């Protein structure tokens, strides 16, 4: 955050991200997108749609959708095909994450590109892969 802001780049964050970084003593983004506070909220910036589906892999998951290009930026709530586990769940809610992933599977069937938080970009199959990893973890 500090590096970006020192270059004159505005950093925007979910309200919970600001709270968590403050509590952790980390660099705090200076802009909060207050409209994303509630699960299910969406904010549009031109053709870009930012949305907060709720707690998942992290409590402050923010995702982005470019409908014209059908690209979903899922962040850490979407696992790459190389991932064989759900990863670190210390700051997340796996039950909510499963519900979010099921919703994403229904809502973004038209996605031609899905960008996970880590690993290779893929397509819609990353959403079903993520759902399977979570379901397997909960067994």
Each model region followed by its residue ranges:
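Metal-dependent catalytic neighborhoods of phosphoester/phosphodiester hydrolases
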Residues: 1-7, 124-129
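Metallo-beta-lactamase
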Residues: 3-125, 129
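Structured segments of extracytoplasmic/periplasmic soluble domains
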Residues: 4-14, 20, 80-81, 100-114, ...
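Glycine-rich, phosphate-binding/catalytic loops in enzymes
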Residues: 5-8, 89-92, 132-134
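Short, surface-exposed linear patches
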Residues: 10-13, 33-35, 55, 72-73, ...
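Short, electropositive alpha-helical surface patch
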Residues: 15, 124-139
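Repeat-unit-sized solenoid/scaffold elements
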Residues: 30, 81-83, 87, 135-139
């Amino acid at each position: 955050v500090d590096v970006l802001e020192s270059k004159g780049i505005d950093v925007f964050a979910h309200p919970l991200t600001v709270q968590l970084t403050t509590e952790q003593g980390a660099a705090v983004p200076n802009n909060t997108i207050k409209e994303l506070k509630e699960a299910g909220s969406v904010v549009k910036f031109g053709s870009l749609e930012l949305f907060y589906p709720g707690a998942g892999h992290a409590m402050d998951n923010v995702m982005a959708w470019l409908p014209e290009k059908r690209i979903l930026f899922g962040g850490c709530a979407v696992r790459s095909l190389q991932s064989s586990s759900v990863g670190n769940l210390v700051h997340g809610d796996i039950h909510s994450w499963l519900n979010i992933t099921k919703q994403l599977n229904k809502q973004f069937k038209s996605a031609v590109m899905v960008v996970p938080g880590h690993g290779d970009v893929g397509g819609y199959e990353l959403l079903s892969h993520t759902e399977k990893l979570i379901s397997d973890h909960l067994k």
